[in-house]
Swiss-Prot record:
BP-aspect Gene Ontology terms: endonucleolytic cleavage of tricistronic rRNA transcript (SSU-rRNA, 5.8S rRNA, LSU-rRNA); maturation of SSU-rRNA from tricistronic rRNA transcript (SSU-rRNA, 5.8S rRNA, LSU-rRNA)
Protein name as catalogued: Pre-rRNA-processing protein TSR1 homolog
Keyword terms of this UniProt record: Nucleus, Ribosome biogenesis
Compositionally skewed regions (Acidic residues) per UniProt: 412-458
Domain (Bms1-type G): residue spans on this chain: 87-247
Location relative to the cell: Nucleus, Nucleolus
Position of the signal peptide: none
Known function: Required during maturation of the 40S ribosomal subunit in the nucleolus.
Organism: Xenopus laevis
Domain of life of the organism encoding this protein: Eukaryota
One term of GO molecular function: GTPase activity
Length: 815
């Protein structure tokens, strides 16, 4: 080998000896165990006891004990309801048919000589029955079937619902509508009764009973039908009401509630518009604490100042409270004792409110505009800032208010746009409304004018053969056009979900500057606290909502202070408007319930609802709807989103009918479980049930993402490359959206390589060859928030009539 030559390195061949690696054995080493334990120390004492296997006889004995305990609990509940230790058994009679309304319904309930009837002079239709012989008492109320709100309020506090059926049809369309609302709210124990069977020939009674059984078995499985025509049949019905098992409603079992049987208003100011309202009734549910807030259904939250204990108006011992006649015998019919000086002498004050222990009525956080502001800089800092500004040129970009720093860095500069940065600030209040409207309006502007579409839709919906002068007088043409437009938008959203046409008269990067692209909707991160709206400074948020809920429920079970269940009390409610008393004077029921801690505060509530099958009108997001959530009623403009287990949830433009949807609104906190009913008010004042469900949670951090889809058409197709047009209309927009991933309807994925020309054509690369009939899509996302339109005032609905002018959405043609 020459001296200057370099020696080649040895390379091992294929037959090099391979030694076996070291094996640590079947067991892990101590270091591996320490790494897996991560500092955890083994328990020195066994925490869980070994399960002891019981013998067959012991297992049988244990099962018998559990069965006996459950039976005793049910019997104790039955015996406490309607006795001296509990409130009277509250029975609400509801007529499910117009012909089933009877004014003398409760004239049959008194069938024994010793029974006592009390007539309430303040609540229309309330009748109390006291039976000293069996030591039971009942309160019967005939509900007004034409007032849906009153009917639902009475059902919230009722122990038993007495449904009255028509012997011919069972229930009518309005009765079926009331049943849908009652089932969605939560149905307590119920009894079905029919009146008027005596007027039917004997030969036809068996057939009519079979027909009624077929009608009721769809709604009430294994329900027994009772007749209510004689006193003997009424006695059998009352026995069934007293002995049947009580059904519990979750939203009221953890709260104290009461139906006001007497009311008195004492003004506290010179105008007489605000004062102290005294409501008397029986405490139900849980103990009533005077330091808690109380909610009067339909009127708001208030403070209690005092709780009194007046004499029981329906005592089981008639010798104490019942007046005597001249002959010395008991009166069978009596009125409730009036509130006067004699009663006031017997009133005992149970408890008075402690101002230091009372809950606050504050429902919103008052944001501090100076919060987060820095202190005023020193002179040295000001000089340093001036020197820094002299050396650098100020870059001004046209961005919307609330855009984050890294989003603003992506926005390209436009010539002459630097001095117009405040143009978008003037339209800040209309951003959300205009943005949603423009998404749907761009596709309609290119097809033709709105007047031509309206004329064509009129010709389709009202043919010449069916026109009639009297019929046309009852048709609102403007309402018909608006409803048809909603049907078209909903149909378009189902066929082309989230697709939006790129505007030609506006720059796309300005039009969609609040949107962003995501690599993956499921896995890409999204900051929960980024660019929150100002309304989020007004709400309350829990660190752990379900942990707080568990703690509040546990405290409610352990507390033992307050008016006990079954006591007849008078509650003094402070700062109540006189309209509440006027409401009671008109014969409308007043229902009050105590609020749990934090339930007066505003937050973001999420409710899981499903579309009611009896309504198919299009319900667009952010439309004003009426909500019945537990004991509360309010109006709000909700967001609709998909129900999933991911951290981001896609918003829905319309209330879907084929799946469950999560509704998000600003509303006072309510701890679940609670039933939810969603109504939409018509132009004539009627309220239609559009969705039912339950309260999901209270979580302002739930991310609702709105998606828009920009579409383009492949112009020239190579192997894996294609020229796409009609997605953008200028070169700058193509460069701006270049980082966003593309997809096609046939499953291809790709990205933008470069723009071609100045008319928005772009060269794109895909993972496979495109088909000529395929469509190129681009997904853009932004987070959306509900509108703060919460209104606790809900107008009372007009008597409901079924809407026959419904349209099948699949038959609506899109222009």
């Amino acid at each position: 080998m020459a001296a200057g030559e370099q020696q080649a390195a040895h390379r091992p061949g294929a037959y090099k000896q391979q030694n076996k690696p070291h094996k640590s054995g079947r067991h892990r080493g101590r270091g591996a165990q320490d790494r897996e334990n991560k500092g955890r120390v083994a328990a020195k004492i066994l925490g869980k006891k070994n399960k002891k296997d019981l013998r067959k006889l012991d297992r049988r004995h244990k099962a018998n004990q559990i069965r006996r305990q459950r039976k005793d609990a049910v019997l104790a509940e039955k015996r406490s309801l309607g006795t001296k230790d509990g409130p009277p058994h509250l029975v609400i009679a509801i007529s499910l048919h117009a012909r089933a309304v009877k004014d003398d319904l409760f004239s049959l309930v008194q069938n024994n000589e010793g029974d006592i009837l009390h007539v309430n002079d303040q609540i229309k239709g309330l009748l109390a029955l006291v039976c000293p012989k069996v030591k039971q008492r009942w309160c019967f109320i005939q509900a007004n079937r034409d007032d849906l709100c009153s009917l639902l309020d009475l059902a919230k506090v009722a122990d038993t619902l007495l449904f009255l059926l028509d012997p011919q049809e069972g229930w009518d369309s309005y009765g079926d509508y009331c049943l849908s609302c009652l089932f969605a709210q939560g149905l307590p124990s119920y009894v079905l009764a029919v009146q008027g069977m005596n007027y039917i020939p004997i030969k036809k009674r068996a057939d009519i009973k079979k027909q009624l059984s077929k009608v009721i078995e769809n709604r009430f499985t294994d329900a027994k039908l009772f007749q209510l025509d004689t006193e003997q049949e009424a006695a059998v019905l009352i026995r069934q009401i007293s002995t049947q098992k009580q059904r519990h409603l979750a939203f009221r079992s953890r709260r104290s509630y009461m139906l006001a049987q007497r009311a008195d208003f004492q003004p506290t100011d010179e105008s007489g518009l605000v004062g102290t309202l005294k409501l008397s009734g029986y405490v139900r549910g849980q103990e009533l604490n005077v330091n808690r807030l109380v909610h009067i259904v339909g009127h708001g939250d208030f403070h209690m100042s005092q709780i009194d204990a007046p004499p029981d108006p329906y005592p089981l011992n008639p010798r104490v409270h019942k007046p005597k006649t001249k002959s010395g015998q008991d009166m069978e019919m009596s009125d409730e004792p009036a509130t006067g000086s004699e009663m006031e002498q017997d009133i005992k004050v149970l408890m008075k409110a402690d101002p230091s222990a009372q809950e606050s009525l504050q429902c919103e956080v008052v944001p501090d505009p100076m919060e987060g502001e820095q202190t005023w800089p020193t002179e040295e800092e000001l000089k340093e800032a001036e020197d820094a500004l002299k050396g650098t040129s100020k870059v001004v970009k046209k961005v919307p208010k609330g855009t984050s720093a890294y989003q603003a860095a992506w926005i390209l500069d436009d010539e002459g746009d630097g001095e117009e940065e405040s143009d978008d600030d003037d339209d800040e209040d209309m951003e959300e409304d205009a943005e949603d409207a423009m998404d749907d309006a761009y596709s309609e502007e290119e097809d033709g004018s709105g007047n031509e579409e309206a004329e064509e839709s009129e010709t389709l919906t009202i043919p010449d053969s069916t026109r009639d002068d009297k019929y046309d007088e009852n048709v609102d043409e403007q309402e018909e056009e608006q409803m048809l437009e909603k049907y078209k938008l909903q149909r378009q959203d189902e066929v082309f979900p989230d697709e939006v046409d790129t505007p030609r008269d506006q720059i796309a990067r300005i039009r969609f500057q609040k949107y962003r692209g995501l690599k993956s909707f499921r896995t890409s991160p999204w900051d929960v606290k980024e660019n929150l709206p100002r309304d989020y400074a007004r709400i309350f948020q829990f660190h752990d909502f379900f942990r707080t809920r568990k703690r509040v429920f546990k405290e409610e079970e352990e507390k033992d202070e307050g008016a006990m269940v079954g006591w007849y009390v008078t509650v003094h409610i402070s700062a109540v408007p006189v309209s509440v008393m006027e409401h009671f004077k008109h014969g409308l029921p007043l229902v009050l319930c105590s609020l749990l801690p934090h339930e007066q505060k505003m937050s973001v509530m999420n409710m899981l609802v499903r579309r009611h099958p009896g309504n198919n009108e299009p319900i667009k997001a952010k439309e004003e709807l009426i909500f019945h959530c537990g004991f509360r009623r309010f109006r709000a403009s909700p967001l609709f989103s998909q129900h999933s287990s991911a951290d981001k949830h896609k918003s829905e433009r319309f209330l879907r009918s084929d799946t469950s949807v999560v509704v998000t609104v600003y509303a006072p906190i309510t701890f679940p479980p609670a039933s939810v009913l969603v109504f939409k008010q018509r132009y004539n004042g009627m309220q239609d049930l559009v969705a039912t469900g339950s309260l999901l949670n209270v979580n302002p951090d739930r991310i609702v993402i709105k998606r828009i889809v920009l579409s383009g058409h492949p112009f020239k197709i190579m192997k894996r490359t294609a020229v796409v047009r009609y997605m953008f209309f200028n070169r700058e927009d193509v460069l701006w959206f270049k980082p966003v991933e593309l997809r096609t309807k046939w499953g291809r994925r790709g990205h933008i390589k470069e723009p071609l020309g100045t008319h928005g054509h772009m060269k794109c690369h895909f993972d496979g060859q495109l088909k000529s009939q395929d469509t190129v899509l681009m997904n853009l996302y932004k987070r959306v928030y509900p509108k703060w339109t919460f209104d606790p005032y809900v107008p009372r609905p007009v008597t409901w009539v079924k809407n026959e002018n419904t349209v099948d959405i699949t038959e609506v043609e899109m222009d």
